[in-house]
């Protein structure tokens, strides 16, 4: 069920590069969280530069206009080591696939209880789900 929200500056990523980012994110989710290929939900936001605001550097990292802000929401229960591995896997795959600096990825993971998600019909289909990875 992971939902990935990919935010980039308008005009910095063409369709092919966005597809590479998208594919790399999904590949990392499949690899690290063991998400099946058909479990695919992504929203891609291209924002004007004046609506994509960020500090130029933080904690020794330097951001460019290629910065990707990525939010990933999934059902809670995965151990800390798995979440840390996911951050690294996403970063490595996106950097390699889309020619993005490893500095230019701000990733936030959100874990929510299964009862807080409905895939339709107002039902919490994963209310009693146990995380796989």
Question: Model-derived features: where do they sit?
Answer:
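Interaction-mediating elements
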Residues: 1-133
